[in-house]
């Protein structure tokens, strides 16, 4: 999975013309109409506005024009951005959509959907929730050096300007969260237990122990000695006098004010206008016109089907006891857990390299950007999930990273590791996102968007694809794959249960614990994530079900002419798209193949 990014670069489901144009086909150049020129000018203007308003996002995609700034996170700025977005949408609606080419009609619809999503997010006051159970603005700031350029003294001075601006940035977020306390728009208290652990490594007396010191520890050797001393002295001062006190102030606010005042209810439906908010989240994160009840029922059906598979695989291990006894065995037998962090990282790296060798048989196009395997940063690890993909700017200066959580090794099961690695690294998030960054024929607002139902659905499909690639030959590993599949199916039940059906936190933990082989620690951290990030967990299974449905359609339509490499290239050729758009892309691919 990926962390939420600035300005909500996701997209709701959109209705598109039936004749969708797939951009992997190069069409002859055609004169651009004045309507298309007006549309492109608006898109370009909004994109530049977006980067100006979100300089951290700009840095993350390799645009360093605003590298000395942090976003304005004040309440006034949030309201102003909503007004600007409304003005962009009003201007867009004055453009005659039908006068655009088929490709630009797709762009029009997706652009409109992004603008409307931002307005809805502001209407529901999502900006008053700048943190969740395992991350937020405070942890993202500590990751900032990964997306910045450090080639010249000017680059370092820009970084120093951001460090010095951090106290005001923290105060703005405290203002947002105080407004949330006043209006009842808060993260549930239960999901924030232990949140202070994510700040322990950020509130440091020695500046050189801060993760934000890293750029000063690797100053280029080409810098003059005097310049190196100046920058390091300035870095120590900024971390000591600005950053650490701001983190300490935020920690005090969290423990003394926010946690005691946070709501005791769990579900998003308990927030102001909460039922409408959760209904919107279901549609946002699935990109489908479904209700919470419909998603819940789909989840129950998937849970039952996967459980039958799990029973079969359990018997293949030679185990003769009950399902619950088998889960206890998996959770307690030391052979299923790494002894050291190095062992876990080496196992994950080996799985990733094995899959690297399989990629040419499954994909026609492979990305240029490499990836590495690394531990989850220490300050994030206690409340973090088992693994996550962390992308980097697509300019080729840094690889992407598959992060593996080496905290609490007794909870990091090895039988799940093949599925986790295929999801987060290749052929999952790294491959999908790196390829999307290389699609130059779509506008930037699409190229750098991340639609959760597509991205997380692809990640779960990538786990399943491991069967075809020769993974999961060990029955315990295959059970781990099914545990992950069950986990995502159970999310449909648990997320809707928590946010639409009044489930308790313990009820959600118990449901995960009784249906998967996840450790109790993972069941707990996952539940807290669902509580604090409502709707997002629905993306995975709903997206995977749609991709597998479309693959079956292609196989049945093309029979002997079906080429899995061409199918995967078609799915990934347009970047991140809503599921209804993906369906039309695949239908267009099938029609082309049938015509050859």
Predicted regions and their residues:
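N-terminal secretory signal peptides that target proteins for export/translocation
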Residues: 1-3
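Bacterial N-terminal signal peptides
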Residues: 6-19
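N-terminal maturation segment of proteins
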Residues: 22-596
